[in-house]
Amino acid sequence: MKKLSVIFLSVSMLSSIAFGDEDKVVATYKGGEVKESQIMQEFKPQLNLQSGETIKNFDDFPLQDQEKLIKIYVNNLLLKEEVAKSSITSSKEFQEKLENAKNQLAQQELLANYIKSNITDKMFDDEYNKYVDNLKGKEQIKVAHILVKSQKEANTVKTKLSKGGNFTKLAEEFSLDKATASNGGIIGYIILNQPGQLVPEFEQKAFALKVNEVSTPVKTSFGWHIIKVLEKKPVPIPTKEEAKVTIDNILAAEILKQYISDLEAKADLKIMLPKANSKTGS
């Protein structure tokens, strides 16, 4: 089972949670008691069923995760009580922040509704076909890297690798990319020139490598990289369902850009700043 932190970071939602016949009390505190159903109901929107997993009841979680859930739930209740006893919600600063938050939430809801109502089946199909055409015949590679601060450090790591050093162990020891270091520096699969992936300098060097080949140090805005290609294979063509999130995001970005542009035009927006290439006084 995935770690609790992974479950909470997911944006997927359970459609329903089935509770057992017995709604057990799992904790008590001065303010009352906590039941399994309360925990599951509280965190239901944040739970995610990973592939092959079935989380229907509180008992499906490992004991250590059950304890974490209970503590988070009770701590939220205790903090809520502390807020109620304080005067924080009546302060001017809080009210201003609350109003700003409400405005932001309202804008997000407005945009979400506008985007949803303007994505048609034809738009989706056209964008999907364009997306698939762009993937046909392309290759994807599985890459790992070791990120360090300076060229000197990169050369040191490269020398260790040249002398038979283990890439996985060196990534764990030296890499500044903590998100991948613990997994041997593995980033995953990338496709050349695919928007939203990696910086061009990294991609160009990576795609020039053979499988199991290690690069010379590569400089990017993040630092210095030692790159290793672990695998190469053709890019699989996703079904419409598999590509739905990607296509929806592409269409949403296009619709949003046009919507904002139209609003600016209707408002007759004129920026009064000097041109970017204009000369300023010395």
Swiss-Prot record:
UniProt catalytic activity: [protein]-peptidylproline (omega=180) = [protein]-peptidylproline (omega=0)
One GO location term (cellular component): cell outer membrane
Domain of life: Bacteria
Coiled coil location: none
InterPro entries reported in the protein's UniProt record: PPIase_dom_sf, PPIase_PpiC, PrsA_foldase
Keywords: Cell outer membrane, Isomerase, Membrane, Rotamase, Signal
E.C. numbers: 5.2.1.8
Keyword Signal: yes
One of the Pfam families matching this protein, by short name: Rotamase_3
GO MF: peptidyl-prolyl cis-trans isomerase activity
Signal peptide feature range: 1-20
Cell membrane found in the keyword field: no
Gene3D superfamilies xrefs: 3.10.50.40
Domain annotation PpiC: ranges: 138-231
Annotated localization: Cell outer membrane
SUPFAM superfamilies xrefs: FKBP-like
Family, as annotated: Belongs to the PpiC/parvulin rotamase family.
PANTHER family in alphabetical order: PEPTIDYL-PROLYL CIS-TRANS ISOMERASE HP_0175-RELATED (PTHR47245:SF2), PEPTIDYLPROLYL ISOMERASE (PTHR47245)
Protein's name according to its UniProt entry: Parvulin-like PPIase
Lineage: Bacteria, Pseudomonadati, Pseudomonadota, Alphaproteobacteria, Rickettsiales
Name of the encoding gene: plp
